[in-house]
């Protein structure tokens, strides 16, 4: 099952938490497709602010996520996200792409 999430500058950790909670209700393997192309304020601090949410959902991530794809708008955002994910240490593979 593919679960799409659109992240904007206004997305809070609480909203991201609700997206994950909803995805787990299906109790099926899932591939997250996270679109962050509308974010204009990308920073390492903002990426790391989501760590608490990801830590909370680690048990379900191990159980249900096959892999995730994050779509970013620039090579700079791709590099920054790659650094942030290295610090966070995700449970499953995360592939980062730019729109073509």
Predicted segments, located by residue:
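Amphipathic, Lys/Arg-enriched alpha-helical "gate/interface" segment within cytosolic domains
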Residues: 1-100
């Amino acid at each position: 099952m593919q679960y799409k999430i659109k992240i904007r500058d206004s997305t809070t950790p609480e909203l991201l938490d609700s997206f994950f909670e909803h995805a787990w209700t299906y109790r099926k393997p899932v591939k997250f497709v996270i679109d962050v192309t509308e974010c204009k304020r990308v920073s390492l601090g903002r990426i790391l602010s989501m760590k608490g949410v990801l830590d909370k959902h680690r048990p379900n991530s191990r159980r249900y996520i096959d892999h995730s794809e994050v779509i970013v708008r620039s090579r700079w955002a791709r590099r920054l996200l790659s650094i942030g994910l290295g610090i966070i240490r995700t449970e499953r593979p995360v592939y980062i792409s730019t729109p073509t």
